[in-house]
Structures are given as C-alpha cells and as structure tokens.
Curated annotation (Swiss-Prot):
The lineage of its organism: Bacteria, Bacillati, Bacillota, Bacilli, Bacillales. This is Small ribosomal subunit biogenesis GTPase RsgA. It comes from Staphylococcus epidermidis (strain ATCC 12228 / FDA PCI 1200). GO terms for biological process: ribosomal small subunit biogenesis. SUPFAM superfamilies: Nucleic acid-binding proteins, P-loop containing nucleoside triphosphate hydrolases. One of its GO terms (cellular component) is cytoplasm. It is found in: Cytoplasm.
C-alpha cells in the first residue's frame, strides 16, 4: 500500500503523486456505496496494480474542503484581483473573503495587471488595500515585469489554490511562473468586464514546497452553505468589534447598542465593508427556503 496526494481528476481517473511519481488510480466500490467521492487534494492510501495503476482504499481526514470546485487540504487561498480589465472591486473581494473564511481557508490577496493601471488608479487601490492589510490580510501587487518566483516564495508551503473571477490573469500568472504549463488564456469581454474561464478541471502543479492550482467555476460565488447568523463571523473586523455589542446574538443590522454600527459611524470600520456585509446579509435572508 502506498500513500500520496490526488493531483488530478479526469474521467473518473485519479492521478496520485507519491514523491514525484504519478499513479493512475480509481476508488474501490465501497466509496460508491458510502456515496463518498475522493477529490483533488485528498491524501489517500492506494494499492498498486500494473506498476503505475491502482485502487484507492482509504481517504485521510480532510483539514478543509472547497465545495466548488471540489479541492481539499488547502494551505492558502490566493484571491486574485486585477487592478483593471476587469476593474478592481472591493465588493467582489469581500465576497471571496467570506467564501474563504466559511471554508476555514487562509486567504491572501494578489492584485494583478499593476502595470496596466494608471498612477491614479493604483494609488486609489493601494489606499483601499491598506484597509485590508490593517485587518490582517497579506497582499501583493504584480505586473508583467514582476518576479513571479519571488512572489510565490512568500506564500505558504503546501497546497496553494488560486481563486478569482475569470479574466483577472490566473492562467497568465501560472504560465509566467511555470512557462512549461502553456495554459490557455482568454481576453476579457469589454462589454461584460470579465472573461471566460479557460481552466476546465482542477489540477495541482508542482512548485517549490508543494503544489499550486487554478480553480474553474470559482467565479460563480455560492453562499448557500452560509446562514445569515454566521455571516458576521466571516467579516473579521466586524466579528472582532461585535464582541463588544450589548447583545451576544447581535447581527449588527437593527439591534440597539450595536458596537459595530458605532464604529462605522466613527469611521473605524469602513462604510463600504459594512455596506457589503448588509448587502450579503439581506441576500442570504431573502433566499428561498431549501428543502
């Protein structure tokens, strides 16, 4: 029996990496009976057959798991936002951060296309990013002339997953970091201010200290797993301020003696962050009941 990590899934075949050696495996029938499927990122025990093939017998407990697309045991989620084309959006950034925290993932913010933005645009974005740095988020800026290896060297060891809307340059980033990948890229639509996802499946690529992956389908953000009462925990600044509210179950919407709203009025919590919290709270409150 060998132990390795699933690095790719195509047509029901799980490719497992064992210290640089790859094996094509399939899960045993017992997984189907349990209605459980291995996912990319899983640590698995498998039995080798025919030298480079085998059957998965056991999936180790997951530290965390992203549902869409399915990836497990993520050490850091890099949220990729472009300075321009598509334009930088704090609302979208906050939504990605909520997703990250809801799945117990450690987020990092990466701003691409630094070189394509005007000086005024970059200054405005940097002022905004200081707010996120103050909250505690690691942030980086890159352009086409950046040292991509040095950028990645700042990231955690283990599995790094790139997330972000289509067109922000995730595949371009990976191609610049590892030119041998030759991943497909697409121009963004001027009318829609976004691109089409060019990544069709999740695959882990080797890097120093671990793996790196792009995520297809991550542009369609889904909050169905989050209840409105949980949302405040996923806005870090609001969560910390909320510990001083009069009522323990305060959701910082209409409740009296709310410390969060007091800090918003003082400007200590940015108005735009609170607005995004309210918008998402209302979206979750108004969604249809699932049966």
């Amino acid at each position: 029996m060998k132990t390795g990590r699933i690095v790719k899934l195509i047509s029901g075949v799980y490719q497992v990496d064992v210290e640089g050696e790859r094996f094509d495996t399939k899960p045993r029938g017992l997984f189907r009976k349990k209605k459980f499927s291995p996912v990319v990122g899983d640590i698995v025990d498998f039995e080798v057959q025919n030298t480079k093939e085998g059957y998965i017998h056991h999936v180790h407990d997951r530290n965390n798991e992203l549902k869409r697309p399915p990836v497990s045991n993520i050490d850091e989620l890099v949220i990729v936002m472009s300075a321009v084309e598509p334009e930088f959006s704090t609302q979208l950034l906050d939504r990605y951060l909520v997703i990250a925290h809801s799945y117990h993932l450690k987020p990092r913010i990466l701003i691409t296309k630094h070189d394509l933005a005007s000086e005024q645009e970059i200054l405005k974005i940097k002022d905004t990013i200081k707010i996120y740095q103050k909250i505690g988020y690691a942030t980086q800026f890159i352009g086409k002339d950046s040292n991509y290896t040095a950028t990645v060297d700042e990231w955690s060891d283990g599995l790094i997953v790139l997330s972000g809307q289509s067109g922000v340059g995730k595949s371009t980033f990976l191609n610049s970091y590892q030119p041998q990948l030759k991943l497909e890229t697409n121009d963004i639509s001027k009318s829609l201010n976004r691109g089409k996802h060019t990544t069709r499946h999740v695959e882990l690529y080797d890097r120093k200290g671990g793996y790196i992956a792009d995520t297809p389908g991550f542009s369609a953000l889904d909050f169905n797993h989050i209840e409105k009462e949980q949302l405040k925990d996923f806005f870090i600044d609001i969560h910390e301020a909320g510990e001083q509210c009069k009522f323990r179950n305060c959701n910082h919407i209409k409740e009296p003696q709310c410390h969060v709203k007091a800090l918003v009025e003082k400007g200590e919590i940015p108005q735009f962050r609170y607005d995004h919290y309210q918008q998402l709270y209302n979206e979750i409150s108004n969604r249809k009941v699932r049966y």
